[in-house]
Amino acid sequence: MQQTVLTSSGAPGAPAIVVRSFEAEGPAPAQASIVIGPAMGVRQDFYAGFAQWLAGQGFRVSTFDYRGVGASLDALGRNSPRGVQADLTDWAQDYEAVVTHARQALPGAPLYLLGHSLGAQLPGFFRHPEQVDGLVSVAAGSGYWRDNAPRLKRTVLYFWHVLVPLATRLCGYFPGRRLRKVGDLPAGVILQWRRWCLDPRYSVGAEGAAAEQSYARVRFPVLALSITDDELMTARGTRNLLALYPNAPQRIDPIAPADVQVRRIGHFGLFRSQFAGTLWPCTIDSLRALATLPAATAARVPPTTA
């Protein structure tokens, strides 16, 4: 594993993005490059075992931390994201900088995104989506609060209307680790995410026509793995996320715990080592299936509102 520090702009003094690269193992050239887009508040360390396993299957894999999170925060010499200037648009630029770096490292091979939750939402803001050959989304959906899973929905309005504004104002960032909610986040990130999650059309509704046009530029195929016992997302939320990508060939594949003879998978489970012999190989099947998604399926997932 090799660690690199990037900046999204390349300019001196720009925020650090710490990237870890796992080179494909074995004598054969890498089959493809994979960039794992992390979920909100999740450090890249969480994906390390899965990334190493993918490298063992012949893929070059990149993981990273958005600015103000994990190793990227450590690179700033800070112990909290207080004062870190970042929002979700900046995070999309960070993500795309990692994609560009991965493309340059392996220019002749396909490049796929494996987006966990937020990691499947932000590619709609890429300035150059043509760099990407496909996206497998994992446990991802619209974050609109009415699309949340039933148990989460019971408390989420308190979270957005009381806890987030109050805690962020008091601390100068969102102290999610202390509150056991999401994770520590820069103020600009959590407050923009709040706007998205309170809008029925999520990011596109909150950001307007420019965001809608940006998502419409995405032409790469999207295959969504929808976890049926996800404690945060719902199938409707997944459908609504895919509806934001109107010109992308797309498909939803549900995964239930019974499919792999376990009691629970949940929002984070697919990346845990207990599924190395079951769900991890399924992700490779999903990556290979991207090329088979016909363009005729694009924009065929109708948006829903409630």
Predicted regions and their residues:
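Conserved alpha/beta-hydrolase
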Residues: 44-80
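Short alpha-helix in the alpha/beta-hydrolase fold that links the catalytic acid
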Residues: 233-244
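Active-site glycine-rich loops that stabilize anionic/oxyanionic intermediates
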Residues: 36-42
